[in-house]
Structure formats: C-alpha cells, structure tokens
C-alpha cells in the first residue's frame, strides 16, 4: 500500500491521475532501473574486489549499494503494473513485496547515509578515541542492526496484498479502510525515518564546517580527511534535500488533506513525482562512492587497468 495509490472509487469520476501514472511511472522507473542497476551493480563489484582491505566506510557503502540494487530489481514489475493500467499479474506474494521493498530501501538508505556521515565525522575529529566505533567489525554489527530494525518496522506493509475487482487485480493502492493506521505510520516514519537522521546530518555538517574554519590545518593529512568527511556529509544532505524531503513533505500533506470523495489531482500528481524522486536516490549514491569512498577511484583504475592488459 502506497500513498500514491488510487482508491477504487476514483475510477467512477473524471479523475486524470490514473492516466498520468500510466504514462509517467513506467518510463521513469525503467530509466531508474537502467542507471541504478548499472551504477550500483558495478559499485558492488568494486567493493567486493577490495574486501580484504575493507574499511568501515566501505562496509556502509557496500550495504547501501546492496539495498539499492535489491530495490532496483523490483522496478520493472512496478513499471509493468502501471503500463497495464494498474493491473497486477505477478501474484499476491510479489504484490506484498513491492511496497515493502520500497520503504525498506528508502529508510535503510537514509540510515546508512546518516551513519556513514557520522562515522566519517567521528573518525576525522576523534580518530583514536572513537576507533572501536569506526572499526570494520562495528560497522558490520551496525549495518545488521539497521537492516533488522528497518525490515521489522516495515513488516506491517506485508499485510496488504492484491485485491481483485471487475477482473482487474490492483496492487500498491491506498485503502480507505486502513487510512487512519497509514496516517499514524506516516507520522512515525517521518519523525524517526527522516527528521531524526536529517537533524543528525545537519549537526555533523555544522560541526565539520566549524572545524574547517578554525586554526590552520596542513593541507595533507588532517585537513584532507576533514574535506573527505565534509564531502560525504554534503552529498548525503543533497540526497536528503532532493530525494527524501519533497516526498516526505508531500506524502504527509497528501495524507492529511486526503478526501475519498475528491480527486485531488494536482497534489496527487505532485506526490507521484516525488515518489520517483525518492526512488531515484539509488542512481545518485554511486556518485557518493566515487567522490567520497575509501580509495574507490584508485581501485576503479586498477580494475580498468586489468581489463586493458
């Protein structure tokens, strides 16, 4: 069940949202699928090539890329559903997995980006005091906790399966009967899944800026590490502002103002667009790996040099 879903009662009125979704979703999802699969698939390959020299940063990035790749694999099914005019043909179990995979990816991405930024900040500012926190072992444990927490928190989405009416099987649609529970889930998700991580990122950003503006630090060594930490945090914040903030804001507004007897086409279409923006974060994360990864560029060059030999 998703807030961009369309209640069945809409089909009885002159609402244009269904046509919009049929035209918009398939092409955008397939574009995200192509670039996301290419970028994250190759990134995973690079990370696995360097597993013997892994760092905590690489561990977080590998988990982030894995989360993105798993989600991206569901996008062709979503594209097919909307291309058929919101008619699901892949069975009840696959339907339940669709919404579940979307929100598991969204919030694991948010938490991996946040923890990655915090760990990089701590490793830069307090490298020896926080060594146990920034170790590879601690990174794997923390990633495991994030996976379990997000997957367990999203488990309620597995309750909602496909529904058949007039020989049309719907999936990913908003159910008026479960609207109140969905509204409560949204408020909790916004607070814990978005606002808390975003505030954490903002604090890290302000602190690292403050450190960089302090007494002069040599260009090599500490200052270079500070800049890499700042790059990580800035890319994470850009992802939050472009991908996650619009969706959470419009999703909440859409739910708060939702009326089952009204089309609400303009707001509904805007929410549809922001959902694809949230999904597109999977395409942007490879830029984080390239510009802020631990020796990612060097390892990338090593792979290409082997290919040319």
UniProtKB/Swiss-Prot annotation:
Record topological domains on the Cytoplasmic side: 48-56, 120-138, 209-229, 293-309
Pfam families named in the record: 7tm_1
UniProt GO cellular component terms: membrane; plasma membrane
Tissue: Widely expressed at low levels, with highest expression in the spleen, thymus and adrenal gland, and lower in the kidney, brain and peripheral blood leukocytes.
Topology feature Extracellular, residues: 1-26, 78-98, 160-187, 251-271
Membrane topology type: Multi-pass membrane protein
Transmembrane spans: 27-47, 57-77, 99-119, 139-159, 188-208, 230-250, 272-292
Top-level division of the source organism's lineage: Eukaryota
Keyword set, alphabetical order: Cell membrane, Disulfide bond, G-protein coupled receptor, Glycoprotein, Membrane, Receptor, Transducer, Transmembrane, Transmembrane helix
Molecular function per GO: cysteinyl leukotriene receptor activity
Protein family membership: Belongs to the G-protein coupled receptor 1 family.
Protein's name according to its UniProt entry: Cysteinyl leukotriene receptor 2
Native source species: Mus musculus (Mouse)
Organism lineage: Eukaryota, Metazoa, Chordata, Craniata, Vertebrata
Protein's gene: Cysltr2
